[in-house]
Amino acid sequence: MRVLVLGGGVVGVTSAYYLARAGHEVTVLDRQPGAGLETSFANAGQVSPGYSAPWAAPGIPLKAMKWLMMRHRPLVLWPQLEPRLYGWLARMLANCTQEAYQRNKGRMVRLAEFSRDALRDLRGETGIAYDHREKGTLQLFRTRKQLDHVGDDTRVLDAYGVAYEVLDPEGCIAAEPALARVRDTFVGGLRLPGDETGDAHLFTQRLAALCADRGVRFRFGVAVARLHHEAGRVTGVETATGEVLRAEAYVAAMGSYTPALLRPLGLSLPVYPVKGYSLTLPVTDEGSAPVSTVMDETYKVAITRLGDRIRVGGTAELAGFSQALRGPRRATLERSLTDLFPAGGDLSRATFWTGLRPMTPDGTPIVGATAYGNLYTNTGHGTLGWTMACGSGRMLADLITGRHPEIAHEDFAERRYRRAA
């Protein structure tokens, strides 16, 4: 079957890989000059099934109000007259109940665990290298209140058989020895030993090369303008230059830009761009740098080791599609790093980056069939695109091929939002 994949980030390229592996003739379109150059370019680097949780959770509305007042706030909301944003926020607030949180976290962990296993399988099949480490994630708590609420997450982890360790400060230092230098900064942590780290951009580029070896065609520098459709099926993709490309199946994997593409077809995807920032800097002292990923729970900042580099990622900024680099957001990332790993890297040589994470109100991606018989979506992964990419691509390839996916998939499809739309 001829399949057009729209989007060349980590989600689009993994989709192409699994489709090609299933025997399909695949073409990938992306407006950038190469693979993984937008949201996948400099994300936090975590592959974190254990940390997969919706932002919509009990207590979040009150926490959000406090965050907005912090100097180094993890959440930034720019006042703007944008009905889509306020509708999205209303849906998110509706998911801040305990029942919704347990349901959403459960399905996110289900996909993330499957995806981590799929990534390991892919690594075994291909030998792909991308500065990966299998040394877990340490969620670090600076306050006793944060530590006391860890049971909200461990109950779901128990239900899905996800390994974890609740650690005292000495246990945290055993996992991340450099933290001994800042022993008074934290009171404990939650370690997720099954988590991994890796450079999503490097992975995406190298997987694209492997896809090309399998016959996948990449057309970079091609912007998608609109979809043609007739009688409940997509009949073609029109590019910005007016060229129309045709296939038998179509995959919309354009991240935050997917809703605008599908809206003229009557499909309303509640995916909003949540802007994140990162710093990437060289390691200057091995013994003072992180071993894997440390998640600073106070500032919601992830500090990740990627080979001879440190990646510091975080902040949730609701500012539409703006990709302006803002100094205060950089200051928050620098504050977290200097608090926890003050001698680990050289901030004077850091590169500052921002990207738009495609977020749904319930935190769960939108993967699967649509109301159009040959149109599929693979978007809405939020901060977990790298974590969920392989599992989403593998699940989607099974659906397009007519095979039953290896995990329950119905609750990831676009139709869960149709009634609300």
UniProtKB/Swiss-Prot annotation:
<dbReference type="Pfam" id="PF01266">
    <property type="entry name" value="DAO"/>
</dbReference>
<comment type="function">
    <text>Oxidative deamination of D-amino acids.</text>
</comment>
<dbReference type="GO" id="GO:0005886">
    <property type="term" value="C:plasma membrane"/>
</dbReference>
<keyword id="KW-0560">Oxidoreductase</keyword>
<dbReference type="InterPro" id="IPR023080">
    <property type="entry name" value="DadA"/>
</dbReference>
<comment type="pathway">
    <text>Amino-acid degradation; D-alanine degradation; NH(3) and pyruvate from D-alanine: step 1/1.</text>
</comment>
<dbReference type="GO" id="GO:0005737">
    <property type="term" value="C:cytoplasm"/>
</dbReference>
<feature type="binding site">
    <location>
        <begin position="3"/>
        <end position="17"/>
    </location>
    <ligand>
        <name>FAD</name>
    </ligand>
</feature>
<dbReference type="InterPro" id="IPR006076">
    <property type="entry name" value="FAD-dep_OxRdtase"/>
</dbReference>
<comment type="similarity">
    <text>Belongs to the DadA oxidoreductase family.</text>
</comment>
<keyword id="KW-0274">FAD</keyword>
<dbReference type="GO" id="GO:0008718">
    <property type="term" value="F:D-amino-acid dehydrogenase activity"/>
</dbReference>
<keyword id="KW-0285">Flavoprotein</keyword>
<dbReference type="InterPro" id="IPR036188">
    <property type="entry name" value="FAD/NAD-bd_sf"/>
</dbReference>
<protein>
    <recommendedName>
        <fullName>D-amino acid dehydrogenase</fullName>
        <ecNumber>1.4.99.-</ecNumber>
    </recommendedName>
</protein>
<dbReference type="GO" id="GO:0055130">
    <property type="term" value="P:D-alanine catabolic process"/>
</dbReference>
